[in-house]
Every structure is written in C-alpha cells, then in structure tokens.
Amino acid sequence: EYDTAMEEAFEADYDKVRSFITGTVGEIKKGLVSREFYYKQCDYMNFLHTLAMSAYPVDISLSATLLIDGKVPAGEVRYQDIRKVYPYENKLVVLRLTGAEILKYLEASYDAWINTVTEPYENAHVLKIKQSKDYSTGKMAWKLAKSPANFDSAAGINYTVDVTKPYGSRVVITDMADGSKFELDKEYTAAITTYRSVGSGGLLKAAGLEDMKSVEDRIVYRGPEFRTILYRYFKKNGSIDPAVVGDPKVVGSWKFVPEFAPAAIKADVELLYGK
C-alpha cells in the first residue's frame, strides 16, 4: 500500500537532495580529448594534474589517464555528472620522493609506453603496440602492449622524452615549472593516486620503493577522493579552463623528442582507435 504520509514527511528532504544533485556546479570551457595524452602534453592531463596540485601544496604531480580514448565535453557540469568527468574512486596520496626516484619512476612509465626506435624512422612504431587476434571479430587488430593506466606523466617539472634512447636515458628533466633547479638528491612532495600508492603498475618499485612499508614511510598526506577535489575546485574556480589548468609556471611542460616522435605516436594511436 502506498504510504502518502511517508512521502509527505520526506518530500522536502527529497526535493533538496534532487535540487543539489541536478544543480550546476561548474563548467568545462573547452572539450577535453584524452587520446592526445599518448603523444603530447594535453589539456586533459593538465586538468588531472591541476586537480592534484590544487588540493595540497605539492611540488610534482604524477598521473595516468582515466580515459583510454574518450572525451569530456564542453558545457555545464551538474553534481551528478562529476562521476562522468572523474570516473574512478581514486583518492589523493602525497609522498616524499627524491629527484633521482622521480626520474626512475618516469623512466619506468615511459618504458611501458614507447619503444626505442632507430633509423630509418619512417615506418617505426614508437608507441608500444602489437597485433593480436580480436576475438569479437576473428581478425587481427592493433592493441597496446601495456595498460595505459600505468602511463604516468608528470606536472610541476619541465622535461623531454627521447624515443631514440634506451630505457634509463630517455627522460631529461631540465628544471622545475617555476624555473628553479631540479636536483636529484633533493626530496620533493609528489601527488599520486591511491591506485598507484598500493604498488599498481610497479612504478614506485621501479623508483626504488621496494615494498609497502617503504611507501608508507614516505606518505605525508592522505587526501579525499578526487571527485570531492573536483567538486571543491569547481566551487572555488567555477570552471575547468585549459588556459588556467595549462599554466606552464604550475604544470610545467614535457614533450617527446626528436621532432618526428609525436606524429609517429599519433599514427600508432590511429591504428588503435581510428582517426
């Protein structure tokens, strides 16, 4: 039997909750395209790094994509849309890493991401892809050799990744985003996700943190879910604006070198997902 008294008793509360979750919390000024991260610094990854760097005073952010090949459309964002913008329940973790450890971390990340290529470069597959059978179609198809969930890039520093160099000598960090010196023996605060903090992807182990105790000893802050951070960012700033989240004095810059590399990786991405 329908309980009208119960409905009337909670109608005001229901209306408040509905109004909140359907209410606008902010705006995406320009659509964010995730696939660009494979071959260059992009607005989408700048957005993820900026979220981490807005929640705690860190020197460096380390993050992978949340979307393998997706888009965050421009326009108003309602509270109930936050899960679409940030689809995982990751939380923020801040830990201390030396410059040398950050360098090793990035070397391991890009080793999962790219091949070392030599001349002639014209037909080289820079992105680590392979052909294997697609069991849904029965045909051969291009696939990533490794999971992009472990393709971490960094913000807060300026660096290059040379695809002609072997593992261990690809990443060159020139300086911090603000122009100050990057030092191998100095400790920095680095933002990562809970996914990464439990050892996923093996990047912290590659950096020299051999076990969970080593990681725990370095943690200086455990933050809220990134969805909460995103909500707070909207309330404070009103929008996700590529011109703001891409501020080079905050997020720094990175790129693949030599010049042919980004276009070659983009061509590999198009083999995976089409143009």
Place the predicted regions along the sequence by residue:
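Catalytic centers of hydrolytic enzymes
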Residues: 1-275
